[in-house]
Each structure stands twice: as C-alpha cells, then as structure tokens.
From Swiss-Prot:
Part of the 30S ribosomal subunit. Gene3D superfamilies: Nucleic acid-binding proteins. It comes from Natranaerobius thermophilus (strain ATCC BAA-1301 / DSM 18059 / JW/NM-WN-LF). Keywords: Ribonucleoprotein, Ribosomal protein, RNA-binding, rRNA-binding. GO terms for cellular component: cytosolic small ribosomal subunit. It comes from the Bacteria. InterPro entries: NA-bd_OB-fold (IPR012340), Ribosomal_uS17 (IPR000266), Ribosomal_uS17_bact/chlr (IPR019984). Belongs to the universal ribosomal protein uS17 family. One of the primary rRNA binding proteins, it binds specifically to the 5'-end of 16S ribosomal RNA. HAMAP family: Ribosomal_uS17_B. The gene is rpsQ. GO terms for molecular function: rRNA binding; structural constituent of ribosome. This is Small ribosomal subunit protein uS17. GO terms for biological process: translation.
Length: 85
C-alpha cells in the first residue's frame, strides 16, 4: 500500500491523558439523502503520538497506518495549529 493511498484527516485533539496516544475529533458535513439538509457528523479516532508533543485543543493532521494497538489505526503526521496556554 502506497502512502499516497492512505486516508488523511484533519481534527482537534480532545484528550491527551494517555501516553503516546491522543483522541482526535474529526468533524464533517454530509447531506441527508432524503431531506437534503446538511448534517454535521463527528467521529473520534485514537492516534499514535510518538513524542507526546500534542496537547488538548491542537489541530492536527492524522494518517491511516497499520494497527498499533487494539483501537489505534491512525498516527499524527503534522500539527497544524497549536493551542495558546
């Protein structure tokens, strides 16, 4: 599998309480098939953060990768925006 074929998402870190693991909330908008109203959807992904460098509130880019643990199939690739302390 090439790296270009891997899924990439952008989201906000909502939990940094685990060691080397971050919970990233990815929000998106879809159109309802029958009523055609735009609906906001959100999903949480557990992502691997090797250096523990992200904090809660950071906007990050995550990429699909091989399973790291039972729930982790994503890794943090880039920090787009840091939170102000």
């Amino acid at each position: 599998m090439e790296r270009s074929n891997r899924k990439v998402r952008t989201g906000r870190v909502v939990s940094d309480k685990m060691d080397k693991t971050r919970v990233v909330l990815v929000e998106g908008r879809t159109k309802h098939p029958l009523y055609e109203k735009t609906v906001k959807q959100a999903k949480k992904f557990k992502a691997h953060d090797e250096a523990n460098e992200t904090r809660e509130g950071d906007v990050v880019k995550i990429m699909e990768t091989r399973p790291t643990s039972k729930d982790k199939r994503w890794r943090i690739v880039d920090i787009i925006e840091r939170t102000k302390l």
